[in-house]
């Protein structure tokens, strides 16, 4: 078992009150640049717009002004200043105050609000606070009529707090407890809709953490069988709306999944084809969706050579195509199942949210890509379950071979739309960098839906052209197609390859998430894709 742990259990509440009246461990006040006075003669550094903060500063004898001046705090995004308050009868009911800069205005994007929440989490964690409040120094323009702005900002800040508190310490002998249990939001509004939005944020951020821990798990722990077990556990936890079907190697052979099984053939760990199905309460289904995720729990076809002057190149070693690179990253090939982690995280969240009117199929052809005498060789011809033949000219272009049979399987379920997610090509990461996923689709309608979803989630995507003329380089003289083409436009030809396994009547999108699946600075998975997938399903819900 990968020993996936429960995410931080935090209770969120929205309250309408004066921030000076709050009681607890740490009060975090979101301060804009316009809340901080530029005048040096003023007794308080805070403007009339931030009346509540100026009032608090006065009651504290100017401590906030003094501390912010010493730290040159000006409300800029990323700035923060925290101070411990003196304890005495009659003073405020909180122990610490933290001023958190948010820039020129209160951030409106989900990503910026989430980053603010992560800053607050870091301060609360450092102080070992059990309770915290997030308050606004001044009401942002447009919030009086803009209920959605308030709801979305509160939800994103709450998500940032949960994600910021999480540390994956499953494989360390020492453990750290998360002390924070209660977070109040002041100035964001209140009511039932706000309560539902905060609960939604908790569900999704917990699912993101689940996905992160799956990707973080080492390959000796998270085998295809264990990934299938984790998926089955999700279905068991939400059995009122989710069911699990796990196909073994024999069943996959009966379904003629020759492309998928060719990849799995070299590993001692057998493949597991995973299919979760979400059906809404009441059974009324207006749309059928499928989400397909690449599930390579390890990709051995990566040889790292130090001091190499090229970034990435394919070479043939012992009859196999192996990537070589200047950076030692073979240990990170555990992240090659990031696509399946995203869809199972989304399944977990949707099992809690229970959207009506939509049926969703979560599919992953899980296996390992290893080297052995039973593995596929360059030049082999394999047959996918739709009858199309593939000449394997590159044994390291294995993810698309597993996705091919998974996409055929999804189409046979009679779905209307499919999104597949995969850490598919280094080419996409080179083109878009470490934080943006590439999307390829022939459907403008599906592109608009997903754009609305990722704008709500704060994740970053960019549409690449599905240039049909590039298909020429994928043609084989002995089979229907090759599994790779030229490195030039490699992310596009990968998308064109997958398109061969999708029915024309089905709206389909391919997401290449090779870049944003991993945070190299923090050396951990990101949980990328979960929140966008959930938003997309909700867009398709009645």
From Swiss-Prot:
Give one GO term, molecular function aspect.
Answer: metalloaminopeptidase activity
Its UniProt entry gives the catalysed reaction(s) as:
Release of an N-terminal amino acid, Xaa-|-Yaa-, in which Xaa is preferably Leu, but may be other amino acids including Pro although not Arg or Lys, and Yaa may be Pro. Amino acid amides and methyl esters are also readily hydrolyzed, but rates on arylamides are exceedingly low; Release of N-terminal proline from a peptide
Gene Ontology CC annotations of this record: cytoplasm
Q: Which Pfam families match?
A: Peptidase_M17, Peptidase_M17_N
Residues annotated as binding Mn(2+) 1: 294, 299, 336, 398
Domain of life of the source: Eukaryota
User: Per UniProt, which keywords does this protein have?
Assistant: Aminopeptidase, Cytoplasm, Hydrolase, Manganese, Metal-binding, Protease
Q: What is this protein called?
A: Putative leucine aminopeptidase 1
Instruction: Give the cofactor note.
Output: Binds 2 Mn(2+) ions per subunit.
By its UniProt entry, which Gene3D superfamilies does this protein fall under?
Answer: Leucine Aminopeptidase, subunit E, domain 1 (3.40.220.10), Zn peptidases (3.40.630.10)
Q: What class of enzyme is it?
A: hydrolase
Positions annotated to bind Mn(2+) 2: 299, 396, 398
Complexes and interactors? Homohexamer (dimer of homotrimers).
**Subcellular localization:** Cytoplasm
| Family named by the database record | Belongs to the peptidase M17 family.
Active site (UniProt): 323, 400
Needed co-factor(s):
Mn(2+)
The EC number(s) given in the record are 3.4.11.1, 3.4.11.5
Which InterPro entries does this one have? Leucine_aapep/pepB, Macro_dom-like, Peptidase_M17_C, Peptidase_M17_leu_NH2_pept, Peptidase_M17_N
Organism name: Oryza sativa subsp. japonica (Rice)
Which BP terms in the Gene Ontology apply to this protein? Answer: proteolysis
What is this protein for, i.e. what is its function?
Answer: Presumably involved in the processing and regular turnover of intracellular proteins. Catalyzes the removal of unsubstituted N-terminal amino acids from various peptides.
């Amino acid at each position: 078992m990968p020993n996936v742990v429960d995410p931080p259990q935090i209770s969120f509440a929205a309250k309408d009150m004066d921030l000076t009246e709050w009681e607890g461990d740490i009060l975090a006040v979101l301060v804009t640049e316009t809340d901080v006075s530029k005048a040096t003669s003023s007794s308080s550094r805070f403007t009339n717009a931030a009346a509540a903060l100026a009032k608090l500063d006065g009651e504290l004898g100017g401590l906030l002004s003094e501390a912010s001046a010493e730290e040159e705090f000006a409300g800029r995004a990323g700035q923060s200043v925290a101070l411990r308050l003196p304890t005495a009868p009659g003073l405020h009911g909180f122990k610490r105050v933290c001023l958190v800069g948010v820039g020129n205005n209160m951030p409106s994007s989900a990503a910026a609000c989430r980053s603010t929440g992560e800053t607050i989490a870091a301060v609360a964690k450092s102080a070992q606070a059990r309770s915290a409040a997030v308050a606004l120094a001044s009401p942002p323009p447009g919030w009086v009529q803009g209920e959605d702005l308030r709801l979305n900002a509160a939800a994103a800040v709450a998500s940032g707090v949960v994600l910021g508190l999480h540390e994956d310490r499953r494989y360390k002998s020492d453990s750290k407890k998360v002390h924070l249990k209660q977070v109040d939001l002041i100035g964001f509004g209140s009511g039932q809709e706000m309560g539902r939005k905060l609960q939604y944020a908790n569900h999704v951020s917990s699912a993101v953490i689940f996905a992160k821990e799956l990707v973080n798990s080492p390959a000796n722990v998270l085998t295809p069988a264990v990934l299938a077990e984790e998926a089955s556990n999700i279905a068991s936890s939400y059995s009122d709306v989710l069911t699990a079907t796990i196909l073994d190697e024999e069943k996959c052979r009966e379904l003629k999944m020759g492309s998928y099984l060719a990849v799995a053939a070299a590993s001692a760990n057998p493949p597991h084809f995973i299919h979760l199905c979400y059906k809404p309460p009441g059974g009324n289904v207006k749309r059928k969706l499928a989400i397909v995720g690449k599930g390579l729990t390890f990709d051995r076809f990566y040889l790292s050579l130090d001091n190499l002057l090229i970034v990435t190149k394919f070479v043939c070693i012992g009859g196999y195509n192996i990537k070589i690179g200047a950076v030692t990253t073979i240990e990170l090939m555990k992240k090659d199942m990031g696509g399946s982690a995203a869809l199972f995280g989304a399944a977990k969240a949707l099992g809690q949210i229970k959207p009506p009117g939509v049926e969703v199929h979560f599919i992953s052809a899980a296996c390992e890509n290893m080297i052995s005498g039973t593995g596929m060789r360059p030049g082999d011809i394999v047959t996918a379950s739709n009858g199309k033949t593939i000449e394997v000219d590159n044994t390291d272009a294995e993810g698309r071979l597993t996705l091919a049979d998974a996409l055929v399987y999804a189409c046979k379920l009679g779905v209307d739309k499919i999104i597949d997610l995969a850490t598919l090509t280094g080419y996409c990461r080179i083109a878009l960098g470490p934080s943006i996923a590439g999307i390829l689709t022939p459907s403008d309608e599906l592109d608009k839906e997903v754009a609305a979803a990722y704008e709500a989630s704060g994740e970053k995507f960019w549409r690449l052209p599905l240039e049909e003329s590039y298909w020429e380089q994928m043609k084989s003289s002995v089979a229907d197609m090759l599994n790779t083409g030229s490195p030039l436009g490699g992310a596009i030809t990968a998308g064109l390859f997958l398109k061969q396994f999708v029915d024309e009547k089905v709206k389909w999108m391919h997401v290449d998430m090779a870049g944003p699946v991993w945070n190299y600075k923090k050396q951990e998975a990101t949980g990328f894709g979960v929140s966008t997938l959930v938003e997309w399903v909700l867009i398709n819900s009645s």
